[in-house]
């Protein structure tokens, strides 16, 4: 089968990229980048939101609305953009490493690894920008924010392991 000729580190990169893709996708999509609790007329209200949706929850009901692009600060658009790019790069990297299993082209593997690192830095930019710009608010960072940090770490680790693997095993093959 196609996996037999690949190195163990290549399989580690593949597994890291799968987890990176799914953590990035979930962090990108769910409305849990922040959570805030406040008391309104004796009723405890919990609000939470992400890049695309905002929700309010009380004992009586929960309502969610999609964010409308009007009136957002430029930094929030930048966070959305870098999160979107991160997700696209992690998907592209995963597709290329799967194609590498079938076509065994070292440059395809190297491109996958490079896209993983680029996606990781897009993820880093998005969560750092969000953290810096919303640090004065009475919000607590929540699970999707943590998933974005996890996706950054997984993507960067996959990139570093992949570059090491490429230099150890595939670099000689490309020179001959």
Residues of each region from the PLM?
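A surface-exposed beta-alpha-beta supersecondary segment
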Residues: 24-80, 97-98
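Signature of small four-pass
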Residues: 2-34, 76-133, 145-172
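Interfacial non-cytosolic loop connecting adjacent transmembrane helices
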Residues: 63-67, 71-74, 131-148
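Short, highly charged, low-complexity non-transmembrane loops/tails of multi-pass membrane proteins
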Residues: 174-176
């Amino acid at each position: 089968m196609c996996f037999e000729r690949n190195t163990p580190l290549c399989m580690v990169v593949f597994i890291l990229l799968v987890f990176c893709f799914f953590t990035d996708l979930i962090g990108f999509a769910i409305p849990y980048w922040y959570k805030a609790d406040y008391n309104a007329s004796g009723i405890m209200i919990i609000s939470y939101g992400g890049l695309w949706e905002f929700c309010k929850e009380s004992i009586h009901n929960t309502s969610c609305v999609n964010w409308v692009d009007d009136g957002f600060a430029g930094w929030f658009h930048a966070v959305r953009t870098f999160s979107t790019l991160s997700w696209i790069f992690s998907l592209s990297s995963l597709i290329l490493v799967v194609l590498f299993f079938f076509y065994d082209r070292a440059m395809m593997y190297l491109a996958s690894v490079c896209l993983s690192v680029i996606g990781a830095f897009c993820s880093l930019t998005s969560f750092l920008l969000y953290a810096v710009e919303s640090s004065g608010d009475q919000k607590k960072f929540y699970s999707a924010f943590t998933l974005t940090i996890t996706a950054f770490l997984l993507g960067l680790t996959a990139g570093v392991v992949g570059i090491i693997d490429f230099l150890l095993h595939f670099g000689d093959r490309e020179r001959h």
